[in-house]
C-alpha cells in the first residue's frame, strides 16, 4: 500500500482529494488541522506520529522533522543500500507529499501585523518536506497547489503518473518555496514602498511586496515613467488578471477597477483597435493590458492616446523609442503566466477576508441551453467572450459582447435591470450576434424583456433563480437563445 503525507494550510479540495486517494489504495498520514479536517469528513487518516513514534512538540513547531519522515521521502528506490537502511531502521517509503505552507504572505500583508505573528507563520517543516520530496521527484509525487489535485488523481487512475509529470510538479514546488522565502526576506528587510498618497490625496499609503514573481504587479519590470500610484496599481492588477484569461491576442482597457473595453483579434494591433472602439471615451486616462508584444505600429497608436499605464509581456526596441517620448506614461513588462492558486484578501474592521481568486471557468459543454432556440456559432462566440470578461466587472454587472469585443458595459448598479439599462443604452452596436451577459441570475423576467426590446437575441447567465422559468418563458416569447452556466461571478 502506498503512503501519502497530507499537511496543508489551504484546505480547499483536500477532503475530496484524500477520499480519492483512499479509493486508489493509499494510506494517509497527516498533522494538526489537516488531520482534523479529514477526520471530521470521516476520511481514514493516521497521525504522522505513528510514523515517527515521536509526539508533536513545542506547539507543533516540531512534528515532521524526523528521519522516519525524511528517510521515507528521500530514499532512492534504485539504490539497494538505501532500501536496506530503511529496512534496518524500520522506516516506510513515502510515495506522495501534499503540502502548502503557513500563510506568511497573508499574515504580513495585514496593516497591523507584529513581528511575533510573522515569525509564528514561518513554516519550517512544510518547506523541508516539499524540498525533500521535490528533490526525489523520480520516485515521489509532490503537490503544492490544490489546482493540481484532479490531474494527479486522473493520472493515477490511468497509470500516467510518470517521471516527466512529477518533474513538472517539482518545478512548481521550488518556485513556490522560492517565492515563500522571498516574502520572508522582504518583510524583515522592510520591502515596502511609500506611495505618494492612497486612493485620495488625504490618505497615506504604501505598497508592501510579498512576492517577486514576474507574473505579478509586484514583480513587474517598470521600463519607463514615474512611480505607480495607489490607483494605478489596483487598476493595473485588474487589467492584468483579465487579459491573462485570453489565449488569442487580447487588449483590455480599465478605468476605476472596471473594464471599459475588451477586444480580441488575429494580432495585437487588431485586438487593441477592438478594445478602443468598444468605448473610445472612457479609455482616456486608462490602463491598458496586452497579452502580446507591443510593436512599433501599436506603439504609434498608443502614443496618440492619453494613457496612464501600458502592460505587456514585451515591448520591441522600436516601440520603446516611440512610447518613452511621453514623459508620464508608465510601461510595465510582465510575464503572462496564469497562477490559479492565487488568493486575495480584503481588510474589514477587526480582521480580513481571504478567498481564492475567481479564475474558475465553465467549459462550453457544461453550459446548458434552456430555451427553445439554441445559439448560433457567432452567438456562442459572443457569449464565451463576454463570460470571460464578466468576473472583472463590479456587480451587479451586465455587459454586451460580440465575437471580437465588448460593446456595452453596465457595472456596479444596485439592481440588475439598472445595469442592463446602462449596457444597452451605451452599446456601440446591437444585432443578432451581440450577446447579453449577466454575472448573476435574473430574479425576475424584466431584464430579459428589456433586452428583447433592444433587439438582443442571445443571453448567457448563471441561472439558479426560483423564477428562472419566468425568464426562460420571456426569452422563448421573443425568440431569444438563453444559456445558463451554473456559476455566478459576483465582484464587490
Curated annotation (Swiss-Prot):
It holds the Pfam family AICARFT_IMPCHas. It comes from the Bacteria. GO terms for biological process: 'de novo' IMP biosynthetic process. Its EC number is 2.1.2.3, 3.5.4.10. Residues 1-144 form the MGS-like domain. NCBIfam families: PRK00881.1, purH. One of its GO terms (molecular function) is phosphoribosylaminoimidazolecarboxamide formyltransferase activity. The keyword Transferase applies. Gene3D superfamilies: 3.40.140.20, Methylglyoxal synthase-like domain. GO terms for cellular component: cytosol. Belongs to the PurH family. Pathway: Purine metabolism; IMP biosynthesis via de novo pathway; 5-formamido-1-(5-phospho-D-ribosyl)imidazole-4-carboxamide from 5-amino-1-(5-phospho-D-ribosyl)imidazole-4-carboxamide (10-formyl THF route): step 1/1; Purine metabolism; IMP biosynthesis via de novo pathway; IMP from 5-formamido-1-(5-phospho-D-ribosyl)imidazole-4-carboxamide: step 1/1. CDD domains: IMPCH (cd01421). This is Bifunctional purine biosynthesis protein PurH. It catalyses: (6R)-10-formyltetrahydrofolate + 5-amino-1-(5-phospho-beta-D-ribosyl)imidazole-4-carboxamide = 5-formamido-1-(5-phospho-D-ribosyl)imidazole-4-carboxamide + (6S)-5,6,7,8-tetrahydrofolate; IMP + H2O = 5-formamido-1-(5-phospho-D-ribosyl)imidazole-4-carboxamide. The IMP cyclohydrolase activity resides in the N-terminal region. Keywords: Hydrolase, Multifunctional enzyme, Purine biosynthesis, Transferase.
Amino acid at each position: 500500500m502506498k503512503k501519502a503525507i497530507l499537511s496543508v494550510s489551504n484546505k480547499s479540495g483536500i477532503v475530496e482529494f484524500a477520499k480519492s486517494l483512499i479509493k486508489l489504495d493509499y494510506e494517509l498520514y497527516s498533522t494538526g488541522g489537516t488531520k482534523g479536517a479529514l477526520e471530521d469528513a470521516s476520511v481514514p487518516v493516521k497521525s504522522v506520529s505513528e510514523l515517527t513514534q515521536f509526539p508533536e512538540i513545542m506547539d507543533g513547531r516540531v512534528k515532521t522533522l524526523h528521519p522516519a519522515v525524511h528517510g521515507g521521502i528521500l530514499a532512492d528506490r534504485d539504490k539497494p543500500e538505501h532500501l536496506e537502511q530503511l529496512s534496518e531502521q524500520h522506516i516506510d517509503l513515502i510515495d506522495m507529499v501534499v503540502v502548502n505552507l503557513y500563510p506568511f504572505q497573508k499574515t504580513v500583508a495585514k496593516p497591523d501585523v507584529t513581528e511575533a505573528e510573522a515569525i509564528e507563520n514561518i513554516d519550517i517543516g512544510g518547506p523541508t518536506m516539499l524540498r525533500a520530496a521535490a528533490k526525489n521527484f523520480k520516485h515521489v509525487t509532490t503537490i503544492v497547489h490544490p489546482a493540481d489535485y484532479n490531474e494527479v488523481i486522473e493520472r493515477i487512475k490511468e497509470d500516467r503518473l510518470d517521471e516527466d509529470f512529477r518533474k513538472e510538479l517539482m518545478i512548481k514546488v521550488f518556485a513556490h518555496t522560492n517565492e515563500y522565502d522571498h516574502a520572508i526576506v522582504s518583510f524583515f528587510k522592510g520591502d515596502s514602498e511609500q506611495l505618494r498618497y492612497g486612493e485620495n490625496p488625504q490618505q497615506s499609503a504604501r505598497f508592501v511586496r510579498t512576492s517577486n514573481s514576474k507574473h505579478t504587479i509586484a514583480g513587474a519590470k517598470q521600463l519607463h515613467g514615474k512611480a505607480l500610484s495607489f490607483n494605478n496599481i489596483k487598476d493595473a492588477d485588474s487589467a492584468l488578471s483579465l487579459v491573462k484569461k485570453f489565449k488569442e491576442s487580447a487588449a483590455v482597457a480599465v478605468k476605476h477597477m472596471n473594464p471599459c473595453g475588451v477586444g480580441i483579434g488575429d494580432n495585437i494591433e487588431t485586438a487593441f483597435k477592438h478594445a478602443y472602439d468598444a468605448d473610445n471615451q472612457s479609455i482616456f486616462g486608462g490602463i491598458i493590458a496586452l497579452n502580446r508584444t507591443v510593436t512599433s505600429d501599436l506603439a504609434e497608436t498608443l502614443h496618440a492616446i492619453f494613457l496612464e499605464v501600458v502592460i505587456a509581456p514585451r515591448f520591441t526596441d522600436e516601440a520603446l523609442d516611440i512610447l518613452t517620448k511621453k514623459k508620464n506614461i508608465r510601461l510595465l513588462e510582465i510575464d503572462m503566466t496564469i497562477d490559479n492558486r492565487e488568493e486575495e484578501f480584503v481588510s474589514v474592521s477587526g480582521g480580513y477576508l481571504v478567498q481564492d481568486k475567481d479564475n474558475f471557468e465553465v467549459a462550453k459543454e457544461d453550459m446548458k441551453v434552456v430555451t427553445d432556440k439554441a445559439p448560433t456559432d457567432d452567438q456562442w462566440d459572443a457569449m464565451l467572450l463576454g463570460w470571460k470578461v464578466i468576473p472583472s466587472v463590479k456587480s451587479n454587472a451586465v455587459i454586451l459582447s460580440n465575437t471580437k469585443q465588448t460593446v456595452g458595459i453596465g457595472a456596479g448598479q444596485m439592481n440588475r435591470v439598472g445595469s442592463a439599462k446602462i449596457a444597452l443604452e451605451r452599446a456601440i452596436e446591437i444585432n443578432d450576434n451581440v450577446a447579453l451577459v449577466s454575472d448573476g441570475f435574473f430574479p425576475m423576467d424584466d431584464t430579459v424583456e428589456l433586452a428583447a426590446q433592444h433587439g438582443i437575441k442571445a443571453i448567457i447567465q448563471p441561472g439558479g433563480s426560483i423564477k428562472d422559468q419566468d425568464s426562460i418563458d420571456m426569452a422563448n416569447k421573443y425568440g431569444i437563445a438563453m444559456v445558463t452556466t451554473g456559476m455566478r461571478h459576483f465582484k464587490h
